[in-house]
């Protein structure tokens, strides 16, 4: 029987309402099941932490509440590992403790025991946790990440495997020192104009210049007013911070890739130019590339067979380009260390006086005598024992942060207890390890004398490890120490430095730098605001 038209509209309306209700009910069921599953999963993860050494733990929210409470008292951009170390101090946590930050991260085990750190890195040779350095892509090409994923890469690599030694770097010291004349002139100009400058930026340019000299054997003009190198470098690295935010990365990535390609093109062109200029094919200005070219011309790299006597193979050129990008970016992490060294020396004038006395006795008391000494006897840097100790103490107090490793095995033993660490992130916490009072008495004090030969209390084995050890160690540590020594030697003879933060600037804990607290607002850990400073010429 046909439905009268007068009843058609109400029936249609009723049918639509029933359809919507049914669809809504159908959607509620999987959503409810998903919520139940998530709650069960979170509860299961949280229960795994029940009997583990850890800070106060919320039954459902894990360690998010305790970290957020700590963060509320700190500057928003403070370096995250410092927050963890403050929690460790507050609750007097042992050298092995666990953090529950699921679902953002897998369970994390923090380690600040030197023996256990040695076992994980040097005995078990645990690899770095996946994705740690990939955040620097595209500034560093993916080719480099594939290279360092090979456990034996340092042996076959066409640069690192050839001449990456302290003895080779010392030969480059005279040219490195000469390249810093422009920096000294700039500091002199800022002193005349009473201008405040960013120490971290100056240190970055200085290390970029010295690393370029070591790699290419040529001056990069990093202190020129419109330097191609510093412009390309900053354009390729500045987006790193914004790209750490997964919501911003898609918007940043296209322009970042474009700037990275420009940076790589500048490096590639310089590599080719260096090869073309290497006229005698073996000898000449000491550099990492010159040593590599000498082996390449003898067909000494099976992974990169020579195409012809006068040309670079495409694969070899790309390997040298990606290596150059990685070395230049990695080396500039030392800019934060040298910046903190200037800050600490300003805060400890007696140590600064001792340091200048050492510089004068070993190399001379003015710029010209120092440059002449380094030209004739670059190994004099090895006689700067207190300078070396100052840098080691600075690295102890302000390391680059924890090293994240893959689980070397399913379990870990410590002090008679066995821990299940399957699917854990293993974090060797330098910030905690370097400030243990049983390893470094009065650990928050700046005391470089503890690192001098014959110190009353020797440093325990494997307790000082800012460059790490085993797989993933910093291959450039010898070069970094040489560069920082050269910079201290040339600047402290002529200039005094003092921090110039605004009164309203954010301030972190004094033990972590105060106004110059460490932030995560750079390629690596960086002093807040880049450490603004004023420079004054020393009274003779």
Swiss-Prot record:
SUPFAM superfamilies: Cytochrome P450. This is Cytochrome P450 monooxygenase ptmG. Keywords: Glycoprotein, Heme, Iron, Membrane, Metal-binding, Monooxygenase, Oxidoreductase, Transmembrane, Transmembrane helix. Heme binds at residue 474. Belongs to the cytochrome P450 family. Cytochrome P450 monooxygenase; part of the gene cluster that mediates the biosynthesis of the indole diterpenes penitrems. The geranylgeranyl diphosphate (GGPP) synthase ptmG catalyzes the first step in penitrem biosynthesis via conversion of farnesyl pyrophosphate and isopentyl pyrophosphate into geranylgeranyl pyrophosphate (GGPP). Condensation of indole-3-glycerol phosphate with GGPP by the prenyl transferase ptmC then forms 3-geranylgeranylindole (3-GGI). GO terms for cellular component: membrane. The keyword Transmembrane helix applies. Its cofactor is heme. It holds the Pfam family p450. The chain crosses the membrane at residues 20-40, 325-345. One of its GO terms (molecular function) is oxidoreductase activity, acting on paired donors, with incorporation or reduction of molecular oxygen. PANTHER family: CYTOCHROME P450 (PTHR24305), P450, PUTATIVE (EUROFUNG)-RELATED (PTHR24305:SF107). InterPro entries: Cyt_P450 (IPR001128), Cyt_P450_E_grp-I (IPR002401), Cyt_P450_sf (IPR036396), Cytochrome_P450_monoxygenase (IPR050121). It is a multi-pass membrane protein. It is found in: Membrane. Glycans are attached at residue 17. It comes from Penicillium ochrochloron. Its EC number is 1.-.-.-. The gene is ptmL. It is an enzyme of class 1 (oxidoreductase). GO terms for biological process: mycotoxin biosynthetic process. Pathway: Secondary metabolite biosynthesis.
